[in-house]
Amino acid sequence: YHKYLFRPRILVRNMYLRKGNLYNQADFYKSLNAFARAGVWQSTNIVVEEVKSKDSSNKLDLIVQLIPAKKFGYEASLEASYSASSNTNSVTAANAGNLLGVSGNISFLNRNLNKEGIKMTNSLLAGVEFNLKPDSNNRKNLINSNEISYTNNISFPRLIFPFAKFSSDKRFISTESFITTRLSYINRINLFNLQSFNFGV
């Protein structure tokens, strides 16, 4: 616990109980839920202890116990699909047939970017679709289409500009902002190529 893993403001932001204030059970559960919802700790607990001192009657100490989760995470997946088509449309017949699609996705997660509980996910997806059936001229394009895309998602545990001023308002129990960027390339053999860029807040 001597390691400087988090900036103090992330702790203050999730704590609804304040020094010198009257103890409130609702604020206790709000604080506990806020720490659990942050997603950067694998275990969260708040211990309430009565101060045992003659000159400190009716006072409580709150001990916040937080066990950090692993900062980095990885995830990989593989998917396959199959479809049979008897399309005779003159425009798309060249790509009709028995289609087998295979795609793979790998994601890298940073749960505590800049020591502020900011989560950033980088994902890379690649896929290819095979045509297992010859066309009407008995010609066969083995690869029907291919695709590759990259997605970056950043999740802030607070409101960001232009709504940042509302982050400190305790009426907002849960505030979160997202910035998502996506680049993709799709190649449909003999039909079209599509490059796209998406950005969202």
Predicted regions and their residues:
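Periplasmic polypeptide-binding modules associated with outer-membrane biogenesis and secretion
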Residues: Y1-V91, L125-A126, F130
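Transmembrane beta-barrel strands of outer-membrane/channel proteins
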Residues: A76-Y82, G104-I106, N122-V128, Y150-N152, ...
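Outer-membrane beta-barrel translocator domains and adjoining extracellular loop/strand segments
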Residues: N87-V91, L132-N138, A164-D169, L191-S196
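Sequence/structural signature of outer-membrane beta-barrel proteins
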Residues: K71, S81-N87, R111, G127-K133, ...
